[in-house]
């Protein structure tokens, strides 16, 4: 599903850029949601160094220098979509709870590096939101804003007809790259994994 959504985003943005439209697009709704909230509201102080160390041992750092890194439970395993694709994806052993990392590149949008540097992140997130709104897989789609790895992100939230949640962060990191991070799963899993992803994302591997 992620491969098709990312591909749809690339196609939509390419068409948008080809039209030479510079109209500002706003695809975010800053109202609070039960699915997505900023990391600052999710994080809590460690009760002891022992508890912190125990939690550290229960997680692993996944990702790459190209796509960035996040923490996930140590029990999660890497998998590859049957349709192919270059995403980095980990799951809990089911096809329900999944985290995906990727980075948008200039060539995907058929634009120059100079144009990529000026590309508005809102445009990218708007395209993702639109592709989900047009998909028959989702019963509800909305936008919000949050923070991931210290960066302001435009977040696209969706609820699948199966009841599964999908949260997608789109943001530009300090190296100029436009990042894509998504988390999908059931509500209970997201309560734990969402703040973990938001607080741990980094473009370098931090042990």
Predicted regions: what is each one?
Residues 69-118:
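Secretory pathway targeting signatures of secreted, lumenal, and periplasmic proteins
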Residues 6, 22-73:
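N-terminal, intrinsically disordered, polar/charged segments of Gram-positive cell-envelope systems
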Residues 6-14:
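Hydrophobic helical h-region of N-terminal Sec-dependent signal peptides
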Residues 177-207:
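Surface-exposed amphipathic alpha-helical segments
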Residues 125-171:
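Signature of long, low-cysteine stretches enriched in small and polar/charged residues
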Residues 16-19:
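C-terminal motif of bacterial Sec signal peptides marking the signal peptidase cleavage site
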Residues 1-4:
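Positively charged n-region of N-terminal signal peptides that target proteins for export
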Residues 54-61, 84-88, 147-157:
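Short, hydrophobic/aromatic-rich segments at coil-to-beta transitions
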């Amino acid at each position: 599903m992620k491969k098709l959504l990312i591909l749809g985003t690339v196609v939509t943005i390419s068409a948008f850029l080809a039209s030479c439209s510079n109209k500002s697009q706003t695809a975010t709704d800053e109202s609070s949601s039960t699915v997505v909230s900023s990391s600052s509201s999710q994080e809590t102080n460690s009760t002891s160094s022992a508890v912190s160390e125990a939690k550290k041992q229960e997680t692993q750092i996944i990702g790459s220098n190209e796509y960035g890194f996040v923490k996930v439970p140590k029990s999660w395993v890497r998998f590859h979509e049957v349709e192919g694709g270059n995403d980095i994806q980990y799951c809990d052993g089911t096809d329900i709870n999944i985290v995906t990392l990727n980075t948008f590149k200039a060539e995907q949008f058929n634009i120059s590096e100079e144009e990529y540097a000026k590309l508005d992140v809102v445009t990218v997130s708007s395209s993702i939101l639109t592709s989900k709104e047009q998909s028959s897989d989702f019963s509800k789609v909305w936008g919000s804003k949050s923070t991931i790895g210290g960066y302001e992100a435009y977040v696209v939230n969706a609820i699948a007809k199966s009841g599964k949640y999908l949260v997608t962060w789109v943001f530009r990191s300090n190296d100029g790259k436009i990042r894509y991070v998504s988390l999908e799963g059931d509500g209970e899993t997201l309560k734990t994994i969402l703040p973990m992803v938001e607080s741990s994302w980094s473009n370098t591997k931090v042990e």
